[in-house]
Amino acid sequence: MLRASASGAKCAVKLIVPLHRGFIVRSDIIPLRLRDSEYVESAVSFAEPLQTYSGKKVAISSRSDLTTYFAAAAAGLILRQGSTHASDAGSQALFQMVESDLANRLSFPWIQPGTPRRRTLALVDANSSHPQDGLGFYRAARELGINVVVLENAGHWLEDPAQAHWREAFIPTRLTNPPEEDVGDHILASLRAYGKPVDGIVTFADSFWYYIARIAHEIGVETAPPDSMRIATNKFLTSKYVGHDAYLASNVDEALRIAKEVALPYPLIVKPCDGWSSEGVSRVESPDAFPAAVKSIDTSRHGTEFVMEPYCDGPEVDVNLVLLDGEVLFAEICDDLPKSADVNGLTVGSLTNFHELYSVYPSALPSKELELLIHSFVDTLLRLGIRNGVMHLEGRVQNSSMEYREQNRMMHLQPRAPQATRPEPSAWLIEINPRPLGMTGSHIIESTYGIDYWGLAAVLGVGDKDRARALSQPYRDGPQYTCVMVFIPADFPPSSQGIFDTDDICADLLARRPDLAQHISRCATLVRRGQKVAHPTTGRHTFLAYFNVFSRAGREEALDLARQVREEVRYSFL
């Protein structure tokens, strides 16, 4: 089908008409699954949340009867036409390639049988500090037809009636982090004040899960056992549970005494029990390094208790799992390249911490080691009684057959030299997060595999098992490319004021390097000019920006493009 564009040039359009009877799994599913398609310039959904379709073929009176076409369509596509597609033969070839691409991306039950039912999900902690941040979950819930009841402190921007389109209700609820012991009572009181049943309750702030699990039965919903959530969200308890030689301390003197009494082998990792974003995580090489490591923990955010445990120098990974009744619906693993504080880390500015620098999707570890990680981590979750949800776990492969080596100013996974005495590889769990990985991190899964973790968290949260199974199915042919998330952490001299003095990091780079721009799926600048940013030595980690950089040619090109993006970033601080 052809239509005239605004410039007078012709372009090809394709409409997607459902031929199965039922309701759409989420209203934006077709644009979501077609992101970064080589053949689609833009995709627009015509569907409403939970919209039903008859599944009948379209009967038209003439080729010009566009109204009937559009009325039946769930979405429309404008195809990407190059010079080779200008002729009729070229257009036919384009349509054939599009059909093949659609078969890859839409070969799953995106039309669900039966009658849809709108469900309600309670969310503890809004997970969004301002209207321009962290809306992915709310957008997903809206497209899924799930009502969200937000429990958050009074005065949050979501309480504003002008923002009511993002939620069903806002219930002012006293929340502190770290939580107060009676926070469960506050949550229960708020849900009773809401006065209507909910189909589920979730949080994306890990420290609240234990308290939610304690009161869940009183509102008629199921979660993992409270003690299990306590272990999963406390890094000391997690380490002890999986058998690490871990110790708990609250100050430097206590840490030094323990290290001496039990003769802990250096290097050690010191990290807060209730931490996030790798804040306050240090590698300690000797007793003299303890004071600086403990000082780097922001106790106002993470509390005073910290873990001491052996440092594992194997390749680091993120393992993301979708669980339903103990079954793994989807699993993927990415490589976290060595950080500045790793023994083999790259030098990036003045950073000497565990701030993320690069994450590469999918992992290049051997399939045997990938299977080992998934089997080990799933076994840990199931032994804890955690059987449902989107899980983000971090770990390493101890005694891996691979190691990182620097090549062309970038770290590459390479086979290690064979050793007859090397132990077999084993999975080393760093932490469990009973939630999806961060919002920006989840975007890369969406574009690489076609799966939105935040939408899955919503449908699993309300117990919608059929939609969870459908939305857990990746592209039929696997990841569409290799993608690298390039993190741009705050880095500036400690003597400066820490005032960000740049406009838009991403817009600047895209304008200067259009050759790199065509390999960037998503990017965002996360701070604004004039904003005061904490220095990394304070224990706070701030991302200035991120870029999701992809290559269809393979991992080596993706890593080189990622290196170029980092080197081209420009910013300044006052």
UniProtKB/Swiss-Prot annotation:
The conditions that induce or repress this protein are given as: Expression is positively regulated by the fumisoquins biosynthesis specific transcription factor fsqA.
Name the Gene Ontology molecular function terms of this record.
ATP binding; ligase activity; metal ion binding
Record has Transmembrane helix as a keyword:
no
- This protein's pathway: Secondary metabolite biosynthesis
UniProt: Mg(2+) 2 binding residues: 431, 433
Q: Which UniProt keywords apply?
A: ATP-binding, Ligase, Magnesium, Manganese, Metal-binding, Nucleotide-binding
Give residue ranges for domain ATP-grasp.
234-462
- What Enzyme Commission number(s) does the record list for this chain? 6.3.2.-
Name the InterPro entries for this protein.
ATP-dep_AA_Ligase (IPR052032), ATP-grasp (IPR011761), ATP_grasp_subdomain_1 (IPR013815), BL00235/CARNS1_N (IPR041472)
What does the entry list as the binding residues for Mn(2+) 1?
Answer: 394, 431
- Cofactor note (record): Binds 2 magnesium or manganese ions per subunit.
Provide the binding site for Mg(2+) 1. 394, 431
Q: For Mn(2+) 2, which residues are the binding ones?
A: 431, 433
Role according to the record = ATP-grasp enzyme; part of the gene cluster that mediates the biosynthesis of the isoquinoline alkaloids fumisoquin A, fumisoquin B and fumisoquin C; as well as small amounts of fumipyrrole as a shunt metabolite. The products of the cluster lead to a brown coloration and are important for growth and conidiation. The nonribosomal peptide synthetase-like protein fsqF, which lacks a canonical condensation domain, is required for addition of a serine-derived dehydroalanine moiety to activated tyrosine but is not essential for the subsequent steps leading to isoquinoline formation.
Name listed for the protein in its UniProt record: ATP-grasp enzyme fsqD
Q: Which organism is it from?
A: Aspergillus fumigatus (strain ATCC MYA-4609 / CBS 101355 / FGSC A1100 / Af293) (Neosartorya fumigata)
What lineage, starting at the top, does this entry show? Eukaryota, Fungi, Dikarya, Ascomycota, Pezizomycotina
Q: Which gene encodes it?
A: fsqD
